[in-house]
Amino acid sequence: LDEMTQHAWRASGFPPQRVLGMAGVLDTARFQALVGLTGVARADEVSAWALGSHGEEMVIPLSQATAGGRPLTELLPAAELAAIVDRARGSGAEVVGLLRSGSAFLAPGRCAADMVLAMAADSGEVMPAAVLADGSYGIRDVYVGLPARLGARGVRGIVELDLRPDELVALREAAERIRARLGALVS
């Protein structure tokens, strides 16, 4: 997704704030649903971010994840949280496997619509989106999933969360892997 979004931006001639991708909203919703299955809170009471890239390079900063206002790290054992993060990373493939033909389209469509509605309403809502990194998180000039404030003209800005060092490293590594794949596409 990140690579396709970067390619679309380059091909479009639009300013980068007008070109963004949707994966993080869906991945976040899937993580919230998985936490909800544990019984510690309803999915709509879970606050979390799916950043980085879609799939194995997804970064869910547990330092920022809460349920009912309480840190998830206080509500669930570390091993259970790690298993939930792993399942969230593979949930797209899991859905495709369950469908047996085709791919998920309802949930991704709903998440994309939520992003469009936030922009149409000029809401300033912060959502995870594939955006052109501007130096935030020490990442620059590559599309990667980051918290983005959305408005009528697209991305108003990138919001910097207070990530733990290991979470920041994982996010930067995801960006570098995206950059490497982009380089391989060009050569």
What kind of feature is each model-predicted range?
Residues 1, 21:
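ADP-ribose/adenylate-binding Rossmann-like module
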Residues 3-12:
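Short Gly/Thr/Asp-enriched flexible loops that form oxyanion-binding sites at enzyme active sites
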Residues 12-18, 27-187:
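C-terminal substrate-binding/catalytic lobe of Rossmann-fold NAD(P)-dependent dehydrogenases
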Residues 2-3, 26:
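Short alpha-helical
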